[in-house]
Amino acid sequence: MHVARQDAEALVYVSLAQLMALEFSTRALSFVGRQPRGSLLSGSHASRLRGRGLDFDELRRYQPGDDLRHLDWRASLRTGNPVVRTFTEERDRPVWVVVDQRMSMFFGSTRSFKSALAAELGALAAWMALRAGDRVGAIVFNDQHIDSITPLRSRTRVQALCSRIVHYNHQLDALQPDAEDSGQLDTVLQRCLAVAGHDHLICLISDFAGAGPRTLQLLRQLATHNDVIALQVYDP
């Protein structure tokens, strides 16, 4: 990921224009790996993540290499030729991008502050979800506040999400006192449990400062019925 920066300030804070420009950096990115050769999925958004069903697409004549398990015997007998069922993948699923902007993130010694990198990663995740045809929403939080944006499949929603991230990012200030660990990360995960019932994708971007046994318990609980991607941001 390459983001042009004009001055040292950009290493600390992100701008809305910067996050919106990341839309064009997602074309080669995906939350999942490529499907194996010979995959039966005929949709353009094949996925190994849970929560996506296969929808019947059409009947067509058998072609060499087709999986015999998908032969439709009734249609084959009716037409006198082997016929197979083809499927497209259900594309729509809610994606929650969870971005940490606590004071523990307001530090960096090399490329950028952790808070700025988390903001960029959050925007990338949102653009990836939209490009995949999914609804995208967000939970953005700092030491005192937690904001939620309901998932929606639209570029306007991604812009609103990025704007909220920028708002939280610009509230960070080195003159602020270090916040005592108040269990905010666990509170955020509880919010995730409340909004993501089943078959959602949660992309959590944080330094995981203050994480403990309860945090792991909540993550496991969240992953029981959802896909969870946790990205830990740290300063080397």
What are these regions, as identified by a protein language model?
Residues 51:
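Catalytic cores of large soluble enzymes that bind and process phosphate-bearing ligands
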Residues 58:
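Acidic, metal-associated active-site segment
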Residues 1-48, 61-66, 75, 84-120, ...:
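Exposed, interaction-prone extracellular/peripheral surfaces
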Residues 54-55:
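Small-residue-rich anion-binding loops in enzyme active sites
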Residues 69-79:
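N-terminal low-complexity, intrinsically disordered segments
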